[in-house]
């Protein structure tokens, strides 16, 4: 991944003894200007994080950081949200909102340029989202990756594939395709689909964290075929356990996953009812079939090498301590 020299990044710094992906300057600046530094440092005051939903991925992000969740964005220190929807929501209220927006999106921001507020207190979770908003003239302060909080469990590898995702407005996660392609290869019974489409075996947000990780651990490969991802936490969670992703090599996946990539064949804006417009990528079904067959016939040495690389990559996303986060 090529990084622009103009990007305000300083990776690998440490803040209060913990590894940080983001500029410590951003975090300290945000805390100091709100006159809360001493309280955070002493652990007296929890960081309040606004999330726009319940039982959703943004809520999980806040939980992994040990933030105190609020649904009042005017009372939040950090806002974990889709930046397109957030900036549309606060238009006209910019002077009343002070939170540091930590965002990722699958929407095509260009389509909503005139509907979004101008707001400079923003960091992104992925470089492709950073570049998307930079092109629109936003002064994004930096990039901080999402974190995971894995549970290391031991399970017999009795499944080949697993996937997890919730598709809204259209099948962005390609769950129906996963159901179809695994049936085509006669391995649907060796596949776990956690989601809301594709004849799912489990619903998305009704599993405990341990149950979710046990399903990951039972599988050899994670099918990460989403047409678009602002970041993409589930395959990274699976990677922490050595599960190898077979993934569309685009959007947030391109910078975050290691495993078996599938090249995208097209990139475009897809609109649902002329209201919800997403930046999406298609994949080659022919190449997908090739890589599914590759996974089914892979040798032990090759698999173990890919599995180790996946685990090594995922280590960079594990929060340094369960008592703190990069925002302290």
UniProtKB/Swiss-Prot annotation:
GO terms for molecular function: glycosyltransferase activity. Coiled coil: none annotated. Pfam families: Glycos_transf_1. Disulfide bonds: none annotated. Its EC number is 2.4.-.-. It is an enzyme of class 2 (transferase). Keywords: Glycosyltransferase, Transferase. Belongs to the glycosyltransferase group 1 family. Glycosyltransferase 4 subfamily. This is Putative glycosyltransferase 41. It comes from Sulfolobus islandicus filamentous virus (isolate Iceland/Hveragerdi). The gene is SIFV0041.
């Amino acid at each position: 991944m090529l990084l622009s020299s103009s990007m305000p990044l300083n990776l690998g710094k440490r803040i209060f003894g913990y590894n940080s992906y983001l500029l410590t300057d951003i975090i300290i600046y945000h805390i100091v200007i709100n006159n809360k530094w001493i309280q955070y440092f002493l652990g007296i005051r929890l960081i309040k994080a606004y999330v726009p939903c319940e039982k959703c991925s943004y809520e999980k992000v806040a939980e992994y950081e040990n933030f105190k969740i609020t649904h009042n964005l005017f009372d939040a220190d950090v806002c974990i949200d889709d930046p397109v929807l957030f900036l549309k929501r606060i238009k006209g209220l910019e002077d009343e909102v002070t939170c540091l927006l930590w965002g990722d999106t699958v929407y095509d921001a260009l389509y909503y340029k005139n509907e979004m507020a101008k707001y400079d207190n923003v960091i992104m979770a992925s470089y492709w989202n950073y570049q998307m908003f930079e092109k629109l003239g936003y002064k994004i302060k930096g990039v901080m990756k999402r974190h995971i909080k894995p549970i290391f469990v031991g399970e017999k590898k009795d499944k080949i594939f697993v996937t997890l995702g919730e598709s809204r407005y259209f099948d962005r996660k390609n769950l129906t395709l996963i159901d179809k392609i695994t049936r085509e290869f006669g391995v649907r019974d060796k596949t776990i689909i956690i989601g809301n489409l594709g004849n799912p075996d489990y619903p998305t947000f009704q599993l405990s964290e341990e149950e979710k990780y046990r399903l990951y651990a039972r599988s050899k490969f994670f099918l990460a075929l989403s047409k678009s991802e602002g970041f993409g936490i589930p395959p990274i969670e699976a990677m922490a356990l050595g599960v190898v992703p077979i993934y569309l090599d685009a959007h947030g996946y391109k910078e975050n996953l290691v495993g078996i990539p599938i090249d995208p064949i097209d990139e475009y804006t897809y609109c649902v009812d002329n209201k919800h417009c997403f930046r999406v990528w298609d994949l080659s079904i022919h190449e997908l079939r090739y890589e599914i067959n590759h996974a089914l016939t892979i040798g032990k040495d090759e698999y173990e090498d890919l599995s180790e690389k996946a685990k090594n990559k995922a280590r960079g996303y594990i929060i340094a301590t369960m008592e703190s986060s990069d925002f302290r």
